[in-house]
Amino acid sequence: FPYVDNPTLYHAVKNSVKENGLRIFLTATSTDELDRKVRSGELKRLSLPRRFHGNPLIIPKPVWLSDFNRYLDKKCLSPKLKSYIEKQRKTGYPLLLFASEIKKGEQLKEILQEQFPNEKIGFVSSVTEDRLEQVQAFRDGELTILISTTILERGVTFPCVDVFVVEANHRLFTKSSLIQIGGRVGRSMDRPTGDLLFFHDGLNASIKKAIKEIQQMNKEA
C-alpha cells in the first residue's frame, strides 16, 4: 500500500528498470495478480514464512457475534463482546481493537470508557490529529486499550498485545488486511503468543482465506 492494485505505479516501476535490471516485490500479503505471474513463470517466488523468534504465526479464532450493531445503536456494548473484553483485561496485556468505520470506533471508545472506567482508552483513525502520540502512549503502556480503524493494520509493533477485530466480515476487512492485522499478535520474544479474535456475524471469503493462508505459512515454516 499504496502500490498494490495501482497500475500506474506498476507501469512507472517497469519503465524505470534498466534493460538487465531486476524487480523484487517484497510483501507479507501477495496479490492475485502476483500469484498469477508466479504460476505462469513470469515471476519466481521466495518465501520467508518463519518469524525471527522461530514461533508460528497466530491463527485467528472466529467468534460469532450477531448483536454488535444492535447494541451499538443503543449506545451499549454487546454482552458477549463485553465478556470477552473482561476476560482479556484480566490478563493485563494491552488490547488492540479494530473497528470497521471511524464512527463506530468513536462510539466504541465512548461505550468502553463508560463500561471500563479503570482502563485508559484511545482511538485512532486516518483523521486523528494526535495519532502518533496515542500510538506511542499505547506502546508505552499509558493506554491499555487502543481502538483503531485499518490505519494500524501494518507498520506498527506493540509488545505482548492481544487483537480483537469487530465485524471482521465487513467489506473493508479484506483478506490482506486481516492477515496484516493478525501479524500484530505474537511479535515479541517476551510473548510470542496472544489472542487473535475475529468477531463476525457470518464467515466470509476474506476471513476463510486469511486463516487458510496463515495456516499455510506455518506449514511452510
Where on the chain are the PLM-derived regions?
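Post-DEXD/H (motif II) to motif III coupling segment of the RecA-like Helicase ATP-binding lobe
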Residues: F1-D67, K74-P79, S83
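Loop/turn-to-beta-strand initiation segments
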Residues: K18-L26, Y93-P94, E142-I145
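Conserved strand-helix element at the start of the C-terminal RecA-like helicase core
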Residues: R23, K74, S78, Y84-Q113
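A short beta-strand-to-loop transition that corresponds to the Sensor-1 phosphate-sensing loop
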Residues: L26-S30, P49-F52, A99-I102, S148-I151, ...
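Short glycine-/polar-rich loops that comprise or flank the Walker A/P-loop
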Residues: K18-L22, G41-K44, P117-E119, P159-D162, ...
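Conserved helicase motor
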Residues: A99-K103, I121-E133, I147-R154
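A short beta-strand element within the Helicase C-terminal
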Residues: V156-N169, I179, D195-L197
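Conserved segment of the helicase C-terminal RecA-like domain
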Residues: K18-E33, K175-L178, G182-Q215
